[in-house]
């Protein structure tokens, strides 16, 4: 028999997937957070998820997040709020215990990014005379040219690529589709990869994935992250990096060169322009640095 909490979580996950078309990774995170709380509630109080009170939720959050970052606590609270709103709508609970729970204040987290010179050094690091190096070069050029998320990059298929048009069809968060353009430099490297490197890597095998490994499968997020770290080391880049370093650089450099914020929002696939606004802080900080360095009265 399926435990009551697990059954409720399953129904909720199915519901939000149908309603919003959330990505598999997001659904997995929802399930993980709710299952963790349900297990705690059962162990500490002998209750199931739908018997939660505000006090129970506060106790869990205080116990689990006493020393963690506000962003982690807020993400989990968002999941709980969404679950109990759904449970109330479905008449599973009589009241929403999260109504009075407020998100913790958190500092503005500005994305780590690279200067244009550092990006050039990173993009020059792969040995494009080898099949794998050419593949890696094409991947990084495309990411910097289009601002793709890592998941969007590694999950791209050959049918999604419009090489002649210079666009890639992408399914982003929430199953939202968009067309992302890329420039001549990325086009040239993609063309070389498709004609020269990809057939050599596949060695007679077939694959629908755009960027392939020797096993004729797509690259994982972790594999691409390892590549970024390796090439950054080779390029002598010592600033903190993330898997989305080139995506952050794409947005910041566009804004530095006067791009419209709404246009950048569309290119990045952000549902809320508030998410894109964070990059304006990076751009302004860069302008302050340039002013301090070059203005005679700075």
Listing of model-derived features with the role each one plays in the protein:
Residues 1-298:
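Conserved catalytic core of the tyrosine transesterase superfamily
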């Amino acid at each position: 028999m399926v435990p009551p909490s697990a059954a409720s979580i399953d129904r909720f996950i199915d519901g939000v997937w149908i309603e919003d078309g959330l990505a598999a990774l997001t659904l997995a995170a929802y399930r993980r957070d709710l299952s963790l709380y349900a297990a705690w509630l059962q162990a500490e109080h002998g209750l199931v998820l739908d018997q939660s009170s505000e006090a129970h939720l506060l106790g869990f959050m205080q116990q689990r997040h006493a020393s963690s970052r506000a962003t982690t606590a807020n993400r989990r609270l968002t999941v709980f709020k969404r679950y109990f709103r759904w449970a109330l709508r479905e008449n599973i609970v009589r009241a929403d215990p999260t109504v009075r729970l407020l998100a913790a204040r958190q500092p503005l987290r500005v994305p780590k990014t690279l200067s244009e010179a550092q990006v050039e050094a990173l993009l020059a690091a792969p040995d494009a005379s080898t099949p794998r190096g050419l593949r890696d070069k094409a991947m990084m050029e495309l990411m910097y040219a289009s601002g793709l998320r890592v998941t969007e990059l590694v999950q791209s298929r050959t049918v999604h690529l419009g090489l002649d048009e210079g666009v890639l069809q992408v399914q982003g968060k929430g199953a939202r589709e968009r067309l992302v353009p890329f420039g001549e430099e990325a086009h040239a490297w993609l063309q070389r990869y498709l004609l020269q490197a990809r057939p050599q890597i596949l060695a007679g095998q077939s694959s629908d994935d755009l960027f392939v490994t020797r096993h004729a499968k797509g690259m994982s997020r972790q594999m691409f992250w390892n590549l970024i770290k390796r090439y950054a080391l080779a390029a002598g880049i010592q600033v903190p990096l993330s898997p989305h370093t080139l995506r952050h650089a794409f947005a910041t450099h566009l804004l530095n060169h006067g791009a419209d914020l709404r246009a950048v929002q569309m290119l990045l696939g952000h549902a809320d322009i508030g998410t894109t606004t964070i990059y304006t802080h990076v751009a302004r900080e860069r302008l302050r640095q340039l002013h301090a360095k070059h203005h005679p009265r700075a």
